[in-house]
Amino acid sequence: MARFLLTLIAATVALVAMVGIEIVLALKREYLATEPALEIGGTFGSASDPPLTFAVLGDSTAAGVGVSRAEHAYATLLAERLAAEGRHVRLLAFGISGARIGDVLREQVPEAIEAEPDLVFVGISANDVIHFTSLDDVRADSSDMVERLRTTGATVVVAGAPDMRAAAWHEPLRSLAGWRGRSVAAAVEEGARAAGATTVPLAERTGPFFARDPEEAYGCDDFHPGAGGYRAWADAIYPELEKALAR
């Protein structure tokens, strides 16, 4: 028994050390620059169609980090699809690289409310995964965020963290990040639904594609989505926007 316990302790220490090394390497890794930011926004569709003000809030992905042209950002792709269904869409993108849910609540939500949007999409919480925001805070901030946005009468759709098993990371960090990401995304969805938002299980819908074809899915840093990844995100998100608007 003593030998077994010593072996177990040694294995645990080795695992913790390995994870620690992977975290250090991940922090030192060079990711895509977030400046200068892409100019995402504008109008889409015919001016004779019914107007729809569409606000997108979130982190670096909402800001289009991972692609070099705004037309490949998921916010733009969603605006184009909404316009294709007979709407004159005004797209407002508030995403800021590095934002956590608390940042969106304090900084982006007030700006979005001033714009009086008809439809809001929030894609958030990858940075909450990385920075270990407590699940209670994630849940509470998600609920508060949706409640405030809905005071404008807007339809609100929310997606939590994507599949966090990024190609940029090695095992066992990759699996641990995936587990943590699922927990955070579930907390986001729980809080958002409680406040009346529609939610998108982004990791579930897009994770298999990112795992199957990382070269097509990721940008050159193997962390942020590239053009193919953002198309997959738009494919996952857009049906929920239409369903929410139809309610």
What are these regions (language model features)?
Residues 164-247:
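Catalytic His-Asp segment of secreted/periplasmic serine-dependent ester chemistry enzymes
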Residues 109, 142-146, 185:
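Generic structural signal for well-ordered alpha-helices
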Residues 93-95, 160, 201-204:
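Residue-level recognition of beta-strand->loop/alpha-helix junctions
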Residues 1-55, 85, 115, 211, ...:
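N-terminal secretory targeting modules
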Residues 26-33, 53-55, 61-140:
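Conserved SGNH/GDSL esterase-like catalytic core that processes O-acyl groups on lipids
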Residues 152-155:
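A short helix->loop->beta-strand "cap" motif at the edges of active sites that frequently abuts
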Residues 123, 159-160:
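Alpha/beta-hydrolase-fold catalytic nucleophile elbow
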